[in-house]
């Protein structure tokens, strides 16, 4: 089994990292380049960089900010927000992104998933799903930063995205986002059991035990934002906890250097 990835998420708007609860009440959490540099040093396996208002405001993700971030970090960087065409994807990859995250544009036109994976490789294409519970064992897909209910069933959409060529799913529970009371186990199990591609769990991490629970529910990677931004937990603490539960993790680079 491959090591579970521990991934901080940088939600960015107006050039600043922000964090809120249930996708609203955003608070400033720092400069994205400086925050990314710190996570790189702290042993994060990857970074997710989401311009959370780019699609809603119909503006492009700031390629310059991506370039400046990529120059300072040496771990895989996934970038999303306002990506509508394969040319947008090319520009971000050329700026230093390793992967791109498609959300609203993929829901509007699923063929962009196939076009992108054919052109750039399946390993570059992440489909982000923002899901909210709408009934018993049912979740709908929301787009435009969680503002619009598409009426699309999240499990069916995950299957479709995988069939079109998504390399992995970034699954965010809107109900759990920012609450710190744990990942949405029911949603995570429903999605991870319906696809064969990796699923990144997002939304709700509040204590170290939540990360191991997400792995039990089928997550291939665990993502958090405010916990890490506000130093309530460190990457190292999460990895040590996972190891204590016999869940394989990737070594922090300092440990790797010592052991070699």
Curated annotation (Swiss-Prot):
Keyword Ribonucleoprotein attached: no
CDD domains attached to this UniProt entry: HisF (cd04731)
Cellular component terms (Gene Ontology): cytoplasm
Cellular localization per UniProt: Cytoplasm
Pfam families the UniProt entry points to: His_biosynth (PF00977)
Pathway: Amino-acid biosynthesis; L-histidine biosynthesis; L-histidine from 5-phospho-alpha-D-ribose 1-diphosphate: step 5/9
Catalysed reaction, written as an equation: 5-[(5-phospho-1-deoxy-D-ribulos-1-ylimino)methylamino]-1-(5-phospho-beta-D-ribosyl)imidazole-4-carboxamide + L-glutamine = D-erythro-1-(imidazol-4-yl)glycerol 3-phosphate + 5-amino-1-(5-phospho-beta-D-ribosyl)imidazole-4-carboxamide + L-glutamate + H(+)
This protein's name: Imidazole glycerol phosphate synthase subunit HisF
Entry EC number(s): 4.3.2.10
Gene transcribed to yield this protein: hisF
Catalytic residues (UniProt): 11, 130
Subunit structure: Heterodimer of HisH and HisF.
Keywords: Amino-acid biosynthesis, Cytoplasm, Histidine biosynthesis, Lyase
Organism encoding this protein: Endomicrobium trichonymphae
